[in-house]
Amino acid sequence: MSAAKARPAEAGETPHRVIQPAGWAKPIGYANGMEARGRTVFVGGQIGWNAQCTFESHDLPGQVLQTLENIVAVLAEANARPEHVTTMTWFVTDRKEYSRSLKEIGRAWKATMGRHYPAMAVVEVSGLVEDEALVEIQATAVIPD
């Protein structure tokens, strides 16, 4: 079963409660926590290759875009949308390159995920299973009851 392509989320568009402790500085580009109720979708680690397992991009922003498109495709198969994502863990092979590329990564994010920012962590790793991969992202989504 193939689902229609999901549209990016609008600002503040989430069926879940964003958790922000009183007095904490507002995070930029992520949430400190999310509360959700419904059917859970677990998206295994996605990397920046296309549906034929071919890398079309060899730079981090390009691979992030493809990785996020892959996540949206998996979500769509479960009738989930970007705004249903409650948490993501990013694994990057070069945190300095990640920091240098934030502007381009932000554009890739908005093109695929919109203005929905779930709870997230970014972890630098020494390598990923696929030698060409520069990023791998796991996601969890909750589709409301």
Per-range role (PLM):
Residues 1-86, 92-145:
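N-terminal presequence-like segments and the immediate start of the first folded domain
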